């Protein structure tokens, strides 16, 4: 990305959110969590990625 540090920081933060959600899902699967709860986290990941894509595209 050829944008300033503030925009890169914002995009990086968005990826950190996705990473946190992924780690949570991995933990939930290992612990045998309720499927619906896992799906809720999966949806959160999808939304975070959607926002990431929008943010990157807006800065293009």
Residue ranges of predicted features:
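Solvent-exposed interaction patches of small proteins and small membrane subunits
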Residues: 1-60
């Amino acid at each position: 990305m050829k944008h300033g540090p503030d925009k890169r920081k914002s995009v990086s933060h968005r990826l950190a959110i996705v990473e946190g959600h992924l780690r949570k899902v991995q933990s939930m699967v290992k612990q045998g969590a309720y499927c619906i709860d896992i799906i809720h986290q999966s949806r959160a990941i999808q939304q975070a990625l959607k926002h990431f894509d929008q943010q990157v595209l807006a800065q293009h």
